[in-house]
């Protein structure tokens, strides 16, 4: 079974300024110019590979991926990553955030 790894995909929590700026979408739209909508919502493995190749080297690839993660996009290729991998990434992030919340609560208790 093939797995995919995405390095450095986390954008600092709370920093959503890039989502508010429509420029990233304009860059993505320009880079994807001429690609049909269905290109990024492929129906077979060949289409998935092709969509991922389009995302390689895109200057807003990480932002596109983070947008999909933040908005729970369950379909399509976003930032060169499949829905299955994004689901795993969200689960990992959620576990990490739960652990951080526990540590934070323990530190607050110790500080009292």
Regions found by a protein language model. Give the residues of each.
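Secondary-structure transition/capping residues
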Residues: 62, 75-76, 97
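Immediate flanking context of iron-sulfur cluster ligation sites
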Residues: 19-59, 66-74
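Short Fe-S-cluster ligation motifs
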Residues: 13-17, 26-29, 81-112
């Amino acid at each position: 079974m093939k797995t995919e790894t995405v390095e450095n995909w986390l954008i600092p929590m709370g920093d959503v300024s890039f989502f508010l700026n429509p420029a990233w979408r304009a860059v993505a739209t320009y880079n994807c110019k001429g690609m049909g909508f269905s290109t990024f919502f492929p129906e077979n493995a060949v289409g998935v590979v092709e969509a991922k190749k389009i995302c390689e080297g895109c200057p807003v690839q990480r932002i596109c991926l983070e947008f999909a993660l933040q908005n729970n996009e369950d379909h399509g290729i976003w930032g060169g990553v499949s829905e299955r991998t994004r689901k795993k990434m969200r689960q990992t992030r959620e576990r990490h955030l739960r652990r951080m919340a526990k540590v934070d609560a323990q530190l607050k208790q110790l500080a009292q």
